[in-house]
Design a protein with these regions (language model features):
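DNA replication initiation modules
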Residues: 67-85, 108, 116-183
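Signature for HUH/AEP ssDNA processing cores
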Residues: 1-110, 119
């Protein structure tokens, strides 16, 4: 659960694009919104109309990267650190300051994601390492889904998400991957 101050911060920077997360799937909680499949079954869909009370009482929260799931309306993107040894996580200091998701790990508290506002310049696509955390993935950028920002094992900093030069960010992410590989 989050405080009213933290929710006010989220509303200021993400407006209605805050969602309750299903703790089992780590995806937005699906809600029946009156729509049906062709065979008549109820259709459960992602939802962004949560009340402040529902958001404050939720154990898991996330922010959508795109407004109303529209590809042409990005609002934020995330740098996601996936290094199983947490070496890449420590190189987050090379990134421009912005809202961060801090996770409790076996190595202590680590920045797990850095979230940036997306402007007209775009956001770099980075997927460095293996196919998954277990197969050697170090860093990736997330732009089309949701970032889990609050859960029992993580919380977020109340630093406003900043806009970033995509070329500069890409250079810094490549540098982080290089430093992680040689460390």
């Amino acid at each position: 659960m989050i405080t009213r101050d933290k929710l006010k911060f989220l509303r200021e920077h993400f407006d209605k694009n805050i969602t309750v997360i299903n703790p089992t799937t780590k995806k937005p909680k699906a809600v029946y919104q009156g729509n049906h499949y062709a065979d008549g079954r109820k259709k459960y869909e992602w939802f962004n109309g949560w009340t402040d009370e529902e958001l404050c009482s939720a154990e898991y929260l996330g922010v959508f990267h795109r407004e109303d799931k529209r590809k042409d309306k990005p609002i934020c993107a995330a740098v996601d650190f996936d290094d199983i040894d947490y070496v890449a996580h420590d190189w987050n200091i090379k990134l421009p300051p912005s809202m961060s998701v801090v996770k409790e790990t076996k190595s202590g508290k680590k920045v797990n994601q850095r979230i940036y506002k997306v402007n007209g310049s775009g956001f770099p696509k980075i997927d460095y390492g293996g196919d998954s955390k277990d197969s050697g993935k170090l860093v990736e950028t997330l732009q089309s889904g949701v970032s889990v920002i609050h859960a029992p094992d993580r919380t977020f900093t109340m630093i406003p998400p900043s806009q970033v030069d995509p070329k500069e960010l890409e250079k810094n992410l490549n540098l982080i991957c290089f430093f992680t590989e040689v460390q």
